[in-house]
Swiss-Prot record:
One GO MF term: RNA binding
Sequence motif Nuclear localization signal, location on chain: 187-195, 203-216
Source lineage: Viruses, Riboviria, Orthornavirae, Negarnaviricota, Polyploviricotina
Membership in a protein family: Belongs to the influenza viruses polymerase PB1 family.
Protein name: RNA-directed RNA polymerase catalytic subunit
Length: 757
């Protein structure tokens, strides 16, 4: 049946159809090759926006640095990073005046966090620049490597396990004359394979000691590694994002904790809340502006866009903000918080992998690493790349570019939101002292501005004043990309508002479908996504029912588990037909075993195993959920798991789904090819780390898991815990005397071994 698409929209208000124009179906674009070019663009643009600043040289690293703070006031509409310190401080003061005690209280909350946070907070997060190996690693490995190197260089404060003590080590490491690190390297040898008698290349991984002098160490500690941002929809060009090393991360975490605490208390802040809570917060601001504008005033809203938010922000400005916010706090606290912006003022951007050259005639490929860009002959490059390299050369040191101004993407989202809100806060009548006034919403670089005034001239004047005020603190509202509308219709962080938020359903499209984890998780995630969209995104019952049928169809094709009585032939049909025929209660078979689908929109919240349990044959139940069955994964016994789903904008979200361990919740094995590469040592470290953590969690179930205070090690904690538990179990008669004696003996042996080591 052919459908004329326009018919679909006859009954749909225009604003609800907006979601159909979004580039959210199909695969998002990914980048290939190196991000070196994008990173050079970022560095060059950032310097261009601040070009009228003052140049200085960092005495420790020799890096040239540009400081645009308190630079010339802009005379045109070009984006610029010349923030004025006194203006920023005044904006902070007014923000505090409108919210008495806000900074004081947030500082107290943060101080508590600083004293309690454990160093394992830094293991969260994905790829992290590992300064010991000079490339990216999983966060946990990068942290373990850093601590290992610190300890071998005599820095041991981190052994307490508190993040603040680890940061003391970081500070001390920067004063040392040098650091000795262990790097991994590969040896290749040609050997004859005993089985096939062919020559094969054998790789072995060696570790070697290397000494970094103070300058080289500082450069690495201040380095942000760069990559290309993947899967960005609706953009023609890719852009670079940064990942900082372990020295910077802890300090950034505390600054963001403080800023988050402030944002939570600001009604104009779109962070740190999300989803429905965010919509409610925004709706309140709009309601306030609309009720106040009744009949006498006009009210207009700007859907705002800022030009290159990060590249015009400045760490020195953040330092000024922190200095003001913490002005009555103890010295140690002020110092800890001021380090992150200071490090960012001296940051270095690593240019990534470099360029790949191909010679068509000779079929040769060669890579020019970033380190060589400083002195390679430019005749090999095309025009645009040549310009980039020429511009960046004065800034290069060891394959990294000095980048003092600007804040790479996503580093201080909360703190920059505080800055944005402080300007929105100045829109109150008591500050504008005229007939117009404004309010709005800010979420990192995205904003919506609502201006009220008696007439159109007043609205224009209000917008102009807002625009100029922003310029004074390094925020550049884009006149080309922002648009103004009567209040009641605007967009903010991809939420569309029209007398209330309309569901932008297309954003959720990428998360529908089969995730590809395993049969059990995929079924559970699939129905949970549909359920969540019925709750949050206006997914109606008929559409949800259709989505469910499409999902089941997709699922059956993915896992080749068509119903046992179907005619479709796949490589699993023989086994599934056999199972179907010998099953008495066919309704009890899981869909992944060729059973019928019993889901409808009323029972999406029930895991499939539970839904069908009463209908299953007894022997089927026994095979499916028998803990002795070697295929039943008992890695997670918790009833809730987390899946990563990809909404269309923003980072991948974590979504909870019910997990029931059955023969279908298998975990695929790691690809073996990694075992022959230089990553192997790292993989083994990671598994070791994982095993220790899992073991530790077995001893401390989450209910009783109070993180050990003081400097007892993990092993000591586990031994003492084992002794306490054993005594309780023995006295209550749960274990026999012999078992109790054996446990005590094992504990003593472990302690003895530790003493010998």
């Amino acid at each position: 049946m052919d459908v004329n698409p326009t018919l679909l929209f006859l009954k749909v208000p225009a604003q609800n159809a907006i979601s159909t124009t979004f580039p959210y179906t199909g695969d998002p674009p990914y980048s290939h090759g190196t991000g070196t070019g994008y990173t050079m663009d970022t560095v060059n643009r950032t310097h261009q926006y601040s070009e009228k600043g003052k140049w200085t040289t960092n005495t420790e690293t020799g890096a040239p640095q540009l400081n645009p703070i308190d630079g010339p006031l802009p005379e045109d509409n070009e984006p610029s990073g010349y923030a004025q310190t006194d203006c920023v401080l005044e904006a902070m003061a007014f923000l505090e005046e409108s919210h008495p005690g806000i900074f004081e209280n947030s500082c107290l909350e943060t101080m508590e966090v600083v004293q309690q946070t454990r160093v394992d907070k830094l293991t969260q997060g994905r790829q992290t620049y590992d300064w010991t190996l000079n490339r990216n690693q999983p966060a946990a490995t990068a942290l373990a490597n850093t601590i290992e190197v610190f300890r071998s260089n005599g820095l041991t404060a981190n052994e307490s396990g508190r993040l603040i003590d680890f940061l003391k080590d970081v500070m001390e490491s920067m004063d040392k004359e040098g650091m000795e690190i262990t790097t991994h390297f590969q040896r290749k040898r040609r050997v004859r394979d005993n089985m096939t008698k062919k020559m094969v290349t054998q790789r072995t991984i060696g570790k070697k000691k290397q000494r970094l002098n103070k300058r080289s160490y500082l450069i690495r500690a201040l380095t942000l590694n760069t990559m290309t941002k993947d899967a960005e929809r609706g953009k023609l060009k890719r852009r670079a994002i940064a990942t900082p090393g372990m020295q910077i991360r802890g300090f950034v975490y505390f600054v963001e904790t403080l800023a988050r605490s402030i944002c939570e208390k600001l009604e104009q802040s779109g962070l740190p809340v999300g989803g429905n809570e965010k919509k409610a917060k925004l709706a309140n601001v709009v309601r306030k502006m609309m009720t106040n504008s009744q009949d006498t005033e006009l009210s207009f809203t700007i859907t705002g866009d800022n030009t290159k938010w990060n590249e015009n922000q400045n760490p020195r400005m953040f330092l000024a903000m922190i200095t003001y916010i913490t002005r009555n706090q103890p010295e140690w606290f002020r110092n800890v918080l001021s380090i992150a912006p200071i490090m960012f003022s001296n940051k270095m951007a690593r240019l990534g992998k470099g360029y790949m050259f191909e010679s068509k005639s000779m079929k040769l490929r060669t890579q020019i690493p970033a380190e060589m860009l400083a002195n390679i002959d430019l005749k090999y490059f095309n025009e645009s790349t040549r310009k980039k390299i020429e511009k960046i050369r004065p800034l290069l040191i060891d394959g990294t570019a000095s980048l003092s101004p600007g804040m790479m993407m996503g580093m201080f989202n909360m703190l920059s939101t505080v800055l944005g809100v402080s300007i929105l806060n100045l829109g109150q009548k008591r500050y504008t002292k005229t007939t117009y006034w404004w309010d709005g919403l800010q979420s990192s670089d995205d904003f919506a501005l609502i201006v009220n005034a008696p007439n159109h001239e007043g609205i224009q004047a209000g917008v102009d004043r807002f625009y100029r005020t922003c310029k004074l603190v390094g925020i550049n509202m884009s006149k080309k990309k922002s648009y103004i509308n009567r209040t009641g219709t605007f967009e903010f962080t991809s939420f569309f508002y029209r007398y209330g938020f309309v569901a932008n359903f297309s954003m959720e499209l990428p998360s529908f479908g089969v995730s590809g984890i395993n049969e059990s998780a995929d079924m559970s995630i699939g129905v949970t996504v549909i359920k969540n969209n019925m709750i949050n995104n206006d997914l109606g019952p008929a559409t949800a029912q259709m989505a469910l049928q499409l999902f089941i169809k997709d699922y059956r094709y993915t896992y080749r588990c068509h119903r046992g009585d179907t005619q479709i032939q796949t490589r699993r049909s023989f086994e599934l037909k056999k199972l179907w025929e010998q099953t008495r209660s066919k309704a009890g078979l899981l869909v992944s075993d060729g059973g019928p689908n019993l889901y409808n929109i009323r029972n999406l919240h029930i895991p499939e195993v539970c839904l069908k349990w009463e209908l299953m044959d007894e022997d089927y139940q026994g095979r499916l959920c028998n803990p002795l069955n070697p295929f039943v994964s008992h890695k997670e016994i918790e009833s809730v798991n987390n899946a990563v789903v990809m909404p269309a904008h923003g980072p991948a979200k974590s979504m909870e789904y019910d997990a029931v361990a059955t023969t279908h919740s298998w975990i695929p094995k790691r690809n073996r090819s990694i075992l022959n590469t230089s990553q192997r040592g790292i993989l083994e470290d990671e598994q070791m780390y994982q095993k220790c953590c899992n073991l530790f969690e077995k001893f401390f179930p989450s209910s009783s898991y109070r993180r050990p205070v003081g400097i007892s090690s993990m092993v000591e904690a586990m031994v003492s815990r084992a002794r306490i538990d054993a005594r309780i179990d023995f006295e209550s008669g749960r274990i026999k005397k012999e078992e109790f004696a054996e446990i005590m003996k094992i504990c003593s042996t472990i302690e003895e071994l530790r003493r010998q080591k």
